[in-house]
Amino acid sequence: MAQQRALETTSHNIANANTKGYSRQEAVLATTTPYSYPGMGAGQVGTGVAVQRLRRLRESFLDAQFRNESKALGRWEVRRDTLEKLEAILNEPGDNGLSKLMDRFFAAWQELAKNPDGDQGLAVRSVVRQEGIALSEAFNHLAAQLNDLTADLNTSIGVRVNEVNSLARQIRDLNAQIVKAESGNMAANDLRDRRDLLLDDLAKVVPIQVEEDRYGAVSIVVRDHTLLSGQQVNELGFDPSTGKVTWPDGVELVAGAHLYGSLEGLQEARDSVVADYKDQLDKLANYIAQAVNAQHKAGAGLDGTTGVDFFEGTDAGSLKVSDAIMGNLETIAAAAPAYDDDHNPVPPPPGDGSNALLIAQLKNGWDSNGDGKIDVVFSGEYNAWVADLGVKGQEASRMVDNQELLTEQLDSRRQAVSGVSLDEEMTNMVRFQQAYNAAARVITAVDEMLDTLINRTGLAGR
C-alpha cells in the first residue's frame, strides 16, 4: 500500500506539472513498528513500511522574498503605464503638440506686426484669432484628457479595493478548509497551494505581512491595519466622490515613506503624478493669458480701443479667446495707443504694429513680477516638464525591468524547490513500480510457502 500511495503521489505531481502555483509533493516513507520475539536475545522482525506523511516541498523564505519584490513591481508598473499615457496625451514632439501651437500663435503676432493695416491686416488678424483659438482649444483638450485620466485612475482604485477584499475573503475560506483538514491529520497541500497563489496576487496589490498560526491559518496585515485575522476580514472601503480608501474604523489607508503595490501606485498616479502635470498645465495657461492680456490691453485696435483682453480664463480648462476678440477683429491691438490733443483715443497711425511685435516677443520670455527681469519662458517651462516626463518615464521603465528580473529570478528559485521535474517523477515512478512489483513477488512467494505447508505437507510418498 505504501508503494501504491507513493505512485499515486507521483501521478499527482505529473498531472500538475504545468499547474500554476502547484508545489511538488513527496510521500515520506517510514518503517512500521517491528515485532519483538519473546525470549532472551530473540530480537525484532520488521513489519514493513507505511506512508508517514505527504510532504509539500515549499520554501516560505523564498515566498516572502518573492512577495516583497512583487509589491514594488506592482507600484512601478502603474507608474510606468501612467507616464506612458501622459506622454501619449501631450503628443510631443508633434505637429499638433502644444509646443508647435505656441510657436504658431506667436508667429502669427509677428506677421501681424509686419502687416497691421488694410485688408491684409484684417486677414492676418483673423489668423491671429484662429491661432489663439487653436492654442486655447489645445489647452482645453489636454485638461479634459488629464481629467479623464484622473477619473480612470479613480475607477481603477475602486477595482483594486474590490480585488483586495475578494482575495482576503478567498484566503479566509481556504484558512477554514486547511484548519479543518489538518486537524483531522489530512494533508491540505493543494489547498495551501491555492492560498499561496492568492497571497502572491494580493502582494502585488498591497504590501502585506503574513503570519501563520499553529493551526495552519494565516493572518494578513496591510501597513498598520489587520486585513485578515481568523475568520474576520476587515474589508477596505472606497468613496468615489472623495477618492479615499478607508478601513472599517474610518481610518484612511495611507502609504508609508515608500510606496508598494498597485493600489498605492494608483493613488500616487492620481494624487501626485497626474495632479502635478495638471497643475503645471494650468500654470502655463494662466501665464500665457496674463502675459498676452497685459500687453494686449496696453495696445490699441484699429479704432483706437484699448484695455481689451485677448484671452479669458485662468486655467487650461477654461482658457478661451475673449468674446470681444471673437466679435470684432478690429479690437485686436496691434498698435501702440494714439491720442489727439485732448488725450482722446484715436485710430493708430498706418503701419504701426509695435504692440503686436511686443506680444510676439513674449515667446522669448515674460517679466511676471514687473522687476525688469524675465522669469518665465513659456516654451522653456513647457519643454522642461515634457523632458522631466520623459526622464521619469524612462526611470519607471528601467525599474519595471529590474523588478521583473528580480521576481523572475526568485520565482525560478522557488520552482527549483517546488516545481515538478518530469524526468525526476518518471524515475520515481519506475522506482516505486519496481518496489511494488517486488513486494507483490514477496507476497506470492509467501502464499506459495503457505500453500505448501498447509496443503502439501505429509503427502510425499503417498
Predicted feature descriptions by range:
Residues M1-R462:
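S/T-rich, low-complexity, solvent-exposed segments of bacterial secretion/appendage proteins
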